[in-house]
């Protein structure tokens, strides 16, 4: 057999083998796909749809919910009886095509089965979702109805067990509860007749009515209690208290008390009507207004009661205090007249004493009338208390001013005595200072000292002359005494300084002898200092001249002499 023929035969055999192997591979793949599709079908078929259908069926749905359930149930029946059977047949056909190596037909059949299963999967998902929604909606509706019924029962129970808490609103509340009961009946009828949408709307409206009524019923008892109990009790208490106060001769700053009682009664009746009409916000606001009116009257009465107590308390001591202040003013007046003969008293002080007398006369009238009015008042006690308080404050103010005026009058004689004693003392001091300076054996008295001495002497003599007037002006005397005292102190300090400078100059001049023989600057300073000392009598300049020269040759010498002098300085003995 030719080689070419052998090669051809071998090639054909190889191709056939390859083709056969390829066919086996394709068939195996298709088998796997068909197995997977079969498994998907079984998974879908085994889903608990039947159980879910039975669960929803057991709810005994009505109306539109029942129609929806029937549609989902029928769809599931169609799927379970027809669609799954069709898929089973198609899988069987595809297996036949695959076993017969009709791969194109098998591929088309497999794709078709896959699409069918996808559609069934979607349908089952929608069926289950629909069933779940029906179940949830039914549970929700059932819960809503149960909650609404419970709320309705609680409202009825509240009205039944506490009718007094709702007062005149009871009939209106019962009417509203009857309307809600009718709405419930309408809801049940519509729901049973298969109109759940309209029934749901009725239930929504019923719930809104019950919630609103519940809120109203929560607020009514406190409002009713105030208009039927609290306010009437407070008003009765006010009227009773008012009658007692009037019997005790109380008067009031407000003349329309009884008309205010009547206005409060009218407000209570009007507010009751607001509560009955369920205008509760307005009723609460009106309640606050009524309470404010009642509180105002309590405040008025309490104010008069407290004012009476305070007025009685003040009246016990005020007349005595007034008498005390009047006596003090009389004493001030008498003392001012006595002193005015000897002293020139300030017109402002005398005028103020007269003003206090006039002011006390008016206060005395007010106090007398007010104290008498306490037993048989002609005005409200609050007015009496205000008058007495004002009078008491005025008397305290006057008393403080009296103390100031008394100190002023007392100071006249004290100031005169002080001035006379100091004038005598200053005369003696001048003589002593004069003798003190003369005993120093100074070459001469500095002009500054003489000027201060004669000025001080003139001031003291002027002070003595002022004290010799028939009527002394103490203000002028005090100013002159102040000037004389200042001059006297200055003169004394100047005397000490002059004597100190003169003494130290003499000591330093003597001490300079140890340097004059060999130090020309010390000799010159000695000559200048001695000349100033003996001719100019400027002891300060003489001291500075010699001390400067000695400090040059012996630092610290001046300070040593000064310290020594201060320890042994002779004091002026007056």
From Swiss-Prot:
Keywords: Cell cycle, Cell division, Cell membrane, Coiled coil, Membrane, Septation, Transmembrane, Transmembrane helix
Protein origin, superkingdom: Bacteria
Record-level GO cellular component terms: plasma membrane; septin ring
Topological category with respect to the lipid bilayer: Single-pass membrane protein
Disulfide bonds: none
Role played: Negative regulator of FtsZ ring formation; modulates the frequency and position of FtsZ ring formation. Inhibits FtsZ ring formation at polar sites. Interacts either with FtsZ or with one of its binding partners to promote depolymerization.
Family: Belongs to the EzrA family.
Protein name: Septation ring formation regulator EzrA
Organism of origin: Streptococcus suis (strain 98HAH33)
């Amino acid at each position: 057999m030719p080689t070419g023929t052998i090669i051809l035969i071998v090639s054909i055999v190889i191709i056939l083998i390859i083709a056969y192997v390829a066919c086996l591979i394709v068939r195996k793949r298709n088998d796997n796909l068909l197995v997977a599709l079969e498994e998907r079908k079984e998974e879908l078929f085994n889903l608990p749809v039947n159980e879910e259908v039975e669960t929803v069926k057991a709810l005994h749905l009505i109306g539109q919910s029942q129609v929806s359930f029937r549609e989902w149930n029928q769809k599931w029946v169609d799927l379970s009886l027809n669609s799954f059977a069709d898929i089973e047949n198609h899988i069987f056909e595809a297996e036949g095509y695959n076993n017969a190596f009709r791969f194109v037909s098998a591929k088309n059949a497999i794709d078709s089965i896959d699409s069918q299963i996808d559609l069934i999967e979607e349908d089952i998902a929608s069926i289950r979702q629909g069933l779940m929604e029906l179940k949830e909606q039914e549970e929700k509706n059932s819960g809503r109805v149960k909650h609404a019924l419970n709320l309705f029962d609680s409202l009825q129970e509240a009205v039944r067990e506490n009718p007094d808490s709702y007062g005149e609103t009871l009939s209106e509340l019962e009417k509203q509860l009857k309307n809600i009961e009718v709405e419930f009946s309408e809801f049940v009828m519509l729901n049973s007749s298969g109109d759940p949408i309209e029934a749901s709307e009725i239930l929504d409206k019923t719930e809104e009515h019950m919630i609103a009524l519940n809120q109203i019923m929560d607020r009514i008892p406190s409002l009713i209690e105030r208009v039927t109990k609290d306010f009437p009790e407070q008003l009765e208490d006010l009227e009773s208290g008012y009658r007692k106060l009037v019997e005790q001769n109380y008067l009031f700053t407000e003349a329309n008390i009884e008309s205010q009682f009547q206005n409060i009664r009218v407000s209570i009746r009007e507010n009751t009507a607001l509560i009955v009409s369920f205008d509760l916000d307005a009723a609460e606001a009106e309640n606050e207004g009524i309470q404010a009116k009642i509180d105002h009257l309590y405040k008025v009465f309490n104010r008069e009661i407290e004012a009476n107590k305070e007025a009685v308390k003040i009246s016990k001591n005020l007349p005595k205090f007034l008498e005390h202040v009047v006596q003090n003013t009389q004493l001030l007046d008498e003392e001012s007249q006595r002193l005015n003969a000897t002293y020139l008293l300030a017109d402002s002080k005398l005028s103020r004493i007269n003003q206090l007398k006039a002011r006390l006369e008016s206060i005395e009238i007010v106090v007398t009338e007010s104290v008498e009015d306490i037993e048989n008042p002609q005005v409200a006690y609050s007015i009496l208390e205000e008058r007495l308080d004002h009078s008491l404050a005025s008397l305290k103010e006057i008393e403080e001013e009296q103390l100031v005026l008394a100190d002023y009058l007392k100071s006249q004689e004290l100031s005169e005595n002080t001035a006379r004693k100091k004038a005598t003392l200053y005369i003696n001091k001048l003589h002593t200072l004069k003798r003190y300076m003369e005993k120093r054996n100074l070459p001469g008295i500095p002009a500054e000292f003489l000027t201060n001495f004669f000025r001080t002497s003139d001031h003291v003599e002027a002070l003595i002359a002022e004290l010799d007037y028939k009527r002394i002006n103490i203000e002028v005397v005090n100013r002159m005494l102040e000037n004389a005292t200042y001059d006297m102190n200055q003169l004394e300090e100047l005397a000490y300084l002059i004597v100190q400078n003169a003494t130290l100059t003499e000591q330093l001049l003597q001490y300079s002898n140890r340097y004059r023989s060999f130090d020309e600057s010390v000799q010159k300073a000695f000559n200048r200092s001695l000349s100033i000392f003996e001719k100019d009598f400027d002891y300060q300049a003489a001291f500075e001249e010699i001390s400067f020269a000695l400090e040059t040759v012996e630092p610290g010498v001046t300070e040593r002499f000064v310290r020594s002098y201060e320890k042994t300085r002779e004091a002026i003995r007056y």
